[in-house]
């Protein structure tokens, strides 16, 4: 069984890849949690735009993907993934997110939890992820 964080990561991967979403479960017997994952409006908006994200930053244990939803590259999505099989606390320079010039990182929140980004310093973010956890941010 997958944890809630792993389920969200699975959905984030599909959304950023613009992969077809298929629900193979029994809708009547599915948990409210699983239905909420499959019907999250923000995740569906990311998935349904038909654009595949590109890797913009990576290390052995961190992967960052981004895609733009407009030609001017002002709006889009960023996925930040803990690829380590255990809890992982790591810093990340804001510049690694390659945000558009006028985007304030203090306004970004995870689509699933509403959790804002945590700052370690003015130019550095701090992530404290559970095993295989990720965030999907809309900018």
Where are these regions (language model features)?
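Aromatic/acidic polysaccharide-binding cleft in carbohydrate-active enzymes
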Residues: 1-49
């Amino acid at each position: 069984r997958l944890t809630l964080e792993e389920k969200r990561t699975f959905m984030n991967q599909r959304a950023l890849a613009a992969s077809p979403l298929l629900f193979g479960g029994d809708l009547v017997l599915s948990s409210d949690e699983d239905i909420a994952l499959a019907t999250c409006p923000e995740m569906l908006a990311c998935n349904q735009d038909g654009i595949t994200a590109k890797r913009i930053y990576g290390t052995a244990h961190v992967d960052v993907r981004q895609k733009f939803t407009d030609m001017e590259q002002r709006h889009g999505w960023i996925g930040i993934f803990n690829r380590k099989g255990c809890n992982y606390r790591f810093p990340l320079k804001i510049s690694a997110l390659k945000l558009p010039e006028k985007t304030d990182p203090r306004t970004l929140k995870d689509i699933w939890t509403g959790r804002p980004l945590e700052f370690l310093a003015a130019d550095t973010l701090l992530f404290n992820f559970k095993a295989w956890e990720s965030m999907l941010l809309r900018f």
